[in-house]
Swiss-Prot record:
<keyword id="KW-0520">NAD</keyword>
<comment type="pathway">
    <text>Amino-acid degradation; L-proline degradation into L-glutamate; L-glutamate from L-proline: step 2/2.</text>
</comment>
<keyword id="KW-0496">Mitochondrion</keyword>
<dbReference type="InterPro" id="IPR016161">
    <property type="entry name" value="Ald_DH/histidinol_DH"/>
</dbReference>
<feature type="active site" description="Nucleophile">
    <location>
        <position position="351"/>
    </location>
</feature>
<dbReference type="InterPro" id="IPR050485">
    <property type="entry name" value="Proline_metab_enzyme"/>
</dbReference>
<protein>
    <recommendedName>
        <fullName>Delta-1-pyrroline-5-carboxylate dehydrogenase, mitochondrial</fullName>
        <ecNumber>1.2.1.88</ecNumber>
    </recommendedName>
</protein>
<dbReference type="InterPro" id="IPR016163">
    <property type="entry name" value="Ald_DH_C"/>
</dbReference>
<feature type="binding site">
    <location>
        <begin position="297"/>
        <end position="302"/>
    </location>
    <ligand>
        <name>NAD(+)</name>
    </ligand>
</feature>
<keyword id="KW-0809">Transit peptide</keyword>
<dbReference type="GO" id="GO:0010133">
    <property type="term" value="P:proline catabolic process to glutamate"/>
</dbReference>
<dbReference type="InterPro" id="IPR015590">
    <property type="entry name" value="Aldehyde_DH_dom"/>
</dbReference>
<keyword id="KW-0642">Proline metabolism</keyword>
<dbReference type="InterPro" id="IPR016162">
    <property type="entry name" value="Ald_DH_N"/>
</dbReference>
<dbReference type="GO" id="GO:0005739">
    <property type="term" value="C:mitochondrion"/>
</dbReference>
<dbReference type="InterPro" id="IPR005931">
    <property type="entry name" value="P5CDH/ALDH4A1"/>
</dbReference>
<feature type="site" description="Transition state stabilizer">
    <location>
        <position position="212"/>
    </location>
</feature>
Length: 575
């Protein structure tokens, strides 16, 4: 008779063998965006109620380690997450992980690993599909409010982030995982059977998420976890409120204890401790280029020193100096509106945001005149909290605050330095105000030469640098675009001339991981535009597409032979 242990082992092996045969629901599609029109009164009422709930009192955000909530209890530091539109308002007091907490989180991830990856794919998938449904229904307005208040987004920017994109990540990753598991060797010789097993990575995954997209946090933890990995997650301090809500939703959806461990804390202290563990298996990162370079170097050093059991996977998406290139044949009105959206929505705090603009001399005056007229007439200047879409006053505004004082100070320096630089001219804006919130207005700066540092430096704010090129030098300007910046994240060409489009498409092949023709360089949609850049913008593993999941599996190929040998010699060994 088979022992209970043997039966359990057979069950788990069978669960792996069935991975490629379980299909996700056929109705998986992109989550529809709620438009929040004037007539959508119910949506507005529900949103206002959630905003009021989060503004009325400060929430205590704990650590979540092995399913246990750990509060400060006067033993741990607290980080006050404030409303960037009203920096006197504390939205959440975020518990900071100690060294012991980090150690416990790593241990919890290791201890949960076997049961989690042995759980059949169907069951793992069901958790993320349910979480997506909870986000898009029961928790929709709470998630919107937490993201709007904590991260400075208007309702539309929050909707396309923490609701639609987040839900899309979870749903489409289930589909992509099913497709990946189904990829098996296409040939088996007579008397043999070949099969591929998509194992999780050995060890645990360390996920480091940024402030600017709640959905990115879902991607960073969801992709590895779905594939059977366990995760230690360090969220951004300034997105802790929405990220903690995401954690609670996953738990409600059935996520087992220890699979994802939520540990906000000092970035350097937490990261150094995690990277020192021999079972560190992968880094899944979104953030600044300099931080990613530093982590990359530390991991490489750890490999050289023999610190790790395996070669850790490194998956990262960082910064960009993204371009809009306008050809003389372009529809100028469309290019203007696209550039306003691509540059100034969410205050330019998207890694994909347009930051450099190349205009033909013959169309420059028309383009800039139209742009400035629109910016002024529509009052796209978030100079006080009463006008901010997340202050509780005007919920319909286009722009809001930048995330915190450090960002505000950096952007102010960019503006003030531009005023002193004889090779730069501020054409529009340059306003800022921190009396109540961290507000920087839309700013357009003209550079006299295409290699000025303002054409290559990422600002991560509502600042656009413009260079005017002679109409006859379109080909040359494509060369300049390709060689100006260390980044290669997003870019766009605006033109009606098909030859110009074809030339730019080919010449700028390696200048952007996401290239747009007659559209703004932001707004990638899961499953439609797989997102990620190369060069110093990251490892280009394409979040929102199927490739990203392959980075979190280790493939084992098994050959089973059904024939028994009768001789050790091959035919060619006989005379």
């Amino acid at each position: 008779m088979l022992s209970a242990r043997c039966l359990k082992s057979i069950y788990f092996k069978r669960s792996f063998s069935q991975l490629g045969h379980i299909k996700p629901p056929k109705h998986i599609r992109n989550e529809p965006v709620k438009p929040f029109r004037n007539i959508d009164l119910k949506d507005w009422d529900l949103l206002r109620a959630s905003l009021m709930k989060f503004k009325s009192s400060s929430l205590e955000v704990p650590l979540v380690i092995n399913g246990e909530r750990i509060y400060d209890n006067n033993e741990r530091a607290l980080f006050p997450q404030t409303n960037p539109a009203n920096h006197q308002q504390v939205l959440a007091n975020v518990t900071q992980a100690t060294e012991k907490d980090v150690m416990n989180a790593v241990k919890a991830a290791k201890d949960a690993k076997k049961d989690w990856y042995n759980l059949p794919f169907y069951d793992r998938s069901a958790i993320f599909l349910k979480a997506a449904d909870l986000i898009s229904t029961k928790y929709r307005y709470d998630m919107l409010a937490a993201t709007m208040l904590g991260q400075g987004k208007n309702v539309y920017q929050a909707e396309i982030d923490c609701i639609t994109e987040l839900s899309d990540f979870f749903r489409y990753y289930v589909k992509y995982a099913s497709d990946l598991y189904a990829q098996q060797p296409v040939e088996s010789a007579d008397g043999t059977w070949n099969k591929a097993e998509y194992r999780p990575l050995e060890g645990f995954v360390y996920a480091v998420s940024p402030f600017n997209f709640t959905a990115i946090a879902a991607n960073l933890i969801g992709a590895p976890a779905l594939m059977g990995n366990t995760v230690v997650w360090k969220p951004s301090q300034t997105a802790a409120l929405s990220n903690y809500l995401l954690m609670t939703v996953l738990e409600e959806a059935g996520l087992p204890k220890g699979v994802i461990n939520f540990i906000p804390g000092d970035p350097v202290q937490v990261t150094d401790q995690v990277l020192a563990d021999k079972d560190f298996g992968a880094l899944h990162f979104t953030g600044s280029t300099n931080v990613f370079k530093s982590l990359y170097g530390k991991i490489q050093s750890g490999v050289v020193e023999g610190k790790y059991r395996d070669y850790p996977r490194i998956i990262g998406e960082t910064g960009g100096k993204n371009f809009h290139l306008v050809h003389p044949s372009a529809n100028i009105s469309h290019a203007v509106l696209s550039t306003i959206r691509g540059t100034f929505e969410f205050q330019g705090q998207k890694c994909s945001a347009a930051s450099r603009l190349y205009l033909p001399e013959s169309k420059s005056e028309e383009f800039l005149s139209d742009m400035f007229g629109i910016l002024q007439s529509q009052n796209v200047v978030p100079m006080n909290t009463s006008a901010s879409p997340i202050s509780g006053g005007n919920l319909r505004g286009f722009m809001g605050p930048v995330i915190h004082e450090q960002s505000f100070d950096k952007l102010v320096k960019v503006i003030e330095d531009a005023k002193k630089d004889p090779e730069l001219e501020i054409l529009y804006g340059g306003q800022y105000d921190k009396s109540q919130g961290w507000f920087v207005g839309p700013t357009v700066i003209k550079a006299k030469r295409p290699d000025h540092p303002y054409m290559s430096t990422e600002f991560f704010g509502p600042i656009l640098t413009v260079y005017e090129y002679p109409d006859t030098e379109f080909n040359e300007i494509c060369d300049i675009i390709d060689n100006t910046s260390q980044y290669a994240l997003t870019g766009a060409i605006f033109a009606k001339d098909r030859k110009a489009i074809e030339y730019a498409d080919e010449k700028l092949k390696f200048s952007a991981g996401n290239f747009y023709i007659n559209d703004k360089c932001t707004g990638a949609v899961v499953s439609q535009q797989w997102f990620g850049g190369a060069r110093m913008s990251g490892t280009d593993d394409k979040a929102g597409g199927p490739n990203i999941l392959s980075r979190f599996v280790s493939i084992r190929n098994t050959k089973e032979n059904f024939y028994e040998l009768t001789d050790f010699k091959y035919p060619s060994n006989y005379e």
